[in-house]
């Protein structure tokens, strides 16, 4: 058990999370807001309670804990759906390290993996057509990872667009627009800065590793 769940109920704290998560104030309407955190503090405290002297958690420990937290979050999504509830992942919880860490009182061995908002979907949302995803051949590799040629990327990009009834008019321009909106955006840079701050506590070399 390498994760914990923080249910956020206080209105002011909800507002802060909505603000730090890219000003997504619709979050405030959700009946349930939960933050899944990768948690090594619990085990370190448990070890100490038993008289052990735990080593400092490393990047591998952080990676494993983050996987645990995300798996638990997806299980909550599936469970919620079985009750007719809708959910949404808020990846922006990784941003604004200082403010989120203070608001949730996170020790150094604990950091957010994701945030979920859960509520009752409207009829319009229930009837909304799901967008087509990329073809499985673009996602699933056999035996080893296969690096694809530019024309292969374009083929699968255009193939998905056709199934979504939004034909690609200018492939380079559309990809560039997405690149600017997501990969090169202000929030993306802030997310990476914040992630480095969270993981700094796990990235320090131990004396054993230095040897």
PLM feature spans:
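Acidic, surface-exposed loops and disordered segments
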Residues: 1-211
């Amino acid at each position: 058990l390498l994760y914990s769940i923080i249910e956020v109920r206080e209105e002011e704290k909800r507002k802060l999370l909505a603000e730090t998560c890219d000003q997504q104030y619709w979050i405030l309407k959700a009946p349930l807001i939960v933050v899944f955190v990768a948690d090594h503090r619990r085990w370190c405290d448990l070890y100490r309670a038993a008289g052990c002297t735990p080593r400092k958690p490393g990047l591998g420990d952080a990676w494993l804990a983050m996987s645990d937290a995300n798996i638990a979050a997806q299980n909550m999504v599936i469970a919620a759906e079985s009750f007719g509830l809708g959910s949404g992942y808020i990846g922006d919880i990784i941003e604004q390290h200082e403010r989120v860490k203070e608001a949730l009182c996170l020790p150094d061995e604990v950091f957010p993996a994701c945030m979920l908002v859960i509520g009752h979907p409207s009829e319009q949302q229930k009837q909304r057509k799901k967008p087509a995803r990329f073809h499985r051949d673009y996602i699933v590799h056999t035996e080893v990872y296969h690096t694809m040629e530019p024309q292969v990327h374009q083929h699968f990009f255009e193939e998905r667009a056709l199934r979504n009834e939004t034909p690609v008019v200018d492939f380079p321009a559309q990809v560039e627009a997405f690149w600017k909106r997501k990969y090169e955006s202000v929030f993306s840079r802030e997310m990476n800065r914040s992630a480095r701050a969270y993981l700094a506590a796990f990235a320090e070399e131990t004396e054993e590793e230095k040897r």
